[in-house]
Amino acid sequence: MASLLSPATPTATSAAFHSCSTAGFSTPTHISSQNSSLSLLSRRGCMMRCSFSPQDIPVDSLSHLPPFLDFQNSLATFSDTQKWGFFVSAGIVWFYLTARPGVLIGAIDAYLLAPLQLGLDTLIGRRLKRSDFLVTEKLGEGSFGVVYAGVLLPKNSTLVDDVRVSKARAKAMDFTGEFKQRVILKKVKVGVRGAEEFGEYEEWFNYRLSRAAPDTCAEFLGSFVADKTNTMFTKGGKWLVWRFEGDRDLADYMKDRSFPSNLESIMFGRVLQGVESVKRRALIIKQIMRQIITSLRKIHGTGIVHRDVKPANLVVTKKGQIKLIDFGAAADLRIGKNYIPERTLLDPDYCPPELYVLPEETPSPPPEPIAALLSPILWQLNSPDLFDMYSAGIVLLQMAVPTLRSTAGLKNFNLEIKSVEYDLNRWRERTRTRPDLSILDLDSGRGWDLVTKLISERGSLRRGRLSAAAALRHPYFLLGGDQAAAVLSKLSFSK
């Protein structure tokens, strides 16, 4: 978990999508057949985009609706100038409500989807409890929580309260039989200042992203509060639960001297043949980076800034997906969730020079509905998403330069980059460490150009860095070699 600093601190801050176009819908029969086709194709993993326009809706089908009749009658009383003014105003309002971070979509989520999710979970009995789980082994520990592996017990299973599973027994367990549904559990620390608060925030952000951008983070199953105290649980303590997708994060893989080759078969399904060693490593890093930035683009589109992007918070699934975890430091700048102006949450090794996701003079957020209405203006003026993009640049540099993967190497880099005012080109000329930049220099230095546009100061206009969407349009990604390798590997397995 990130650390806390006060404002008095004297430092400065997927695969290519197929575009499947379908014919316009003209009759209810066509709608039925089209829907069955869409359902079949979606199960096969094809992303559908229907070519549909309002002209395809018969006017007679709306004429019997009272609101439509009232609208037509009101519009008929308008002059041509008034009609133009009405439609222009409606267009501006629509553009504003749908601009990032999504006032309209956020309102639908908050007032419709979130209560609906809670109601459905309660109705079908999906609420979790302590006796549903068997904790197997400890995986790690942070400032505010302890992470464990575990299993979801069958409904007819009985659990002895004081049972403790040894590490050896956990490894010997059959995860294809009775204990087939593995989970990751995080115990929110009890009695630690700030732990309960961050546990609440992490739960909220995981629920929010499970609805808005489910493929960006590990699948969140919910939470429970322990109802009694024993060797593992403390009464009243909160636990968060995710479906098991992998027990190793990017930092774990980067500790291995063979990185990034140790991820080759995971990312591409096989070892790439006929590709030079340096180019193979570059393709692996590019595929990892593409997934990271794609996930950031999606969460930024919801108004959320992670604020703690680093290898330890990027889990690698067994299917070769990179997913964000640990949202305790995240902020939803659409409604001001977990944003407090007088403090900042950061890891000093990965945070940008501005330290704060918004300028220090930004006031405390108003009530949520007002904050949501003002959020598009705040976002356009301050581009808070660029906070995460600096951290993403550090991750790219670490993956590409072996000497920066160690704690000491990264700290030394941060001292050097600060001394040259966060200008990577000047750092390259002056550093005494002689880093190996061969991976970034491939393809006419496209990787180096990208990283210099991520690791930089914001400037007076609070721009100066690429957003996630702009980074994905950079020539480094447009070459698509990593995507081609991934597609070819899937084709070879399907034969």
UniProtKB/Swiss-Prot annotation:
Its main location: plastid. GO terms for molecular function: ATP binding; protein kinase activity; protein serine kinase activity; protein serine/threonine kinase activity. Signal peptide: none annotated. Transmembrane segments: none annotated. Residues 133-477 form the Protein kinase domain. Pfam families: Pkinase (PF00069). ATP binds at L139, G140, E141, G142, S143, F144, G145, V146, V147, K186. GO terms for biological process: photosystem II stabilization. Keywords: ATP-binding, Chloroplast, Kinase, Nucleotide-binding, Plastid, Serine/threonine-protein kinase, Thylakoid, Transferase, Transit peptide. Its EC number is 2.7.11.1. It comes from the Eukaryota. Disruption phenotype: Not significantly affected in state transitions. Enhanced thylakoid folding and reduced mobility of thylakoid proteins under low-light conditions. The active site is at D308 (proton acceptor). It is found in: Plastid, Chloroplast thylakoid. One of its GO terms (cellular component) is chloroplast. Residues 1-49 form a transit peptide. It catalyses: L-seryl-[protein] + ATP = O-phospho-L-seryl-[protein] + ADP + H(+); L-threonyl-[protein] + ATP = O-phospho-L-threonyl-[protein] + ADP + H(+). Belongs to the protein kinase superfamily. Ser/Thr protein kinase family. Light-dependent serine/threonine protein kinase that specifically phosphorylates N-terminal threonine residues in psbA/D1, psbD/D2, psbC/CP43 and psbH, which are components of the core antenna complex of photosystem II. Phosphorylation of PSII core components facilitates the exchange of chlorophyll proteins between the grana and the stroma lamellae. Also involved in the phosphorylation of the calcium-sensing receptor (CaS). This is Serine/threonine-protein kinase STN8, chloroplastic. It comes from Arabidopsis thaliana.
